[in-house]
């Protein structure tokens, strides 16, 4: 009988401790909970990206120097920002879609200077991002976010998440998941670009 009472007391104590830890954790996350997930009409928060990986990436983004930069320094009217995870199978499927979108944009003289693409690897370290870029033949700049700082500023969106943003930071479109119809998606991007002019 004593063992039974001791066991009940032990479990009751564990419940109280866990509840207390959960309450402290919830209080600590109060500020993080206030960050809304990015949505159409919102303004993209400022965040810093690593220096471009090469002078060709620097030139593509229209940056003056090979130094860390903010999205607001990118020389474009529209920025396509892809948030992905290096271990995400859906993100891997989205890779070829984005490569095709990039090619469509670069092949269109009316769009190639006005629309730029970048990717941010939520939780991804530079080495894994480099491997991703090589394996999937990604032609546009990718940036690591090993501490998920950028991802958290964006409100922890599910991945893959494609944002279409104006150069002033207004979010015009948000797409979650793999894009099923690449041609239609490109037409939408082109229309968004033309509507911004």
Predicted regions and their residues:
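Bacterial N-terminal signal peptides
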Residues: 10-20
């Amino acid at each position: 009988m004593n063992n039974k009472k001791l066991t009940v007391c032990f479990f009751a104590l564990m419940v109280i401790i866990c509840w207390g830890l959960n309450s402290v954790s919830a209080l600590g996350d109060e500020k993080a909970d206030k960050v809304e997930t990015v949505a159409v009409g919102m303004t993209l928060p400022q965040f810093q990206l690593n220096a471009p990986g090469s002078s060709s990436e620097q030139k593509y983004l229209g940056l003056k120097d090979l130094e860390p930069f903010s999205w607001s320094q990118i020389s474009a009217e529209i920025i396509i920002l892809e948030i992905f995870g290096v271990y995400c199978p859906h993100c891997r499927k989205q890779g070829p879609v984005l490569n095709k979108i990039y090619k469509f944009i670069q092949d269109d003289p009316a769009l190639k200077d006005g629309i730029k693409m970048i990717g941010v690897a939520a939780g991804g370290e530079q080495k894994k991002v480099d491997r991703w870029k090589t394996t999937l033949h990604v032609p546009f700049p990718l940036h690591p976010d090993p501490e998920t700082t950028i991802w958290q500023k964006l409100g922890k969106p599910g991945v893959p998440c494609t944002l279409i943003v104006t150069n002033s930071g207004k979010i015009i479109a948000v797409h979650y998941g793999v894009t099923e119809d690449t041609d239609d998606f490109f037409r939408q991007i082109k229309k968004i670009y033309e509507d911004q002019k």
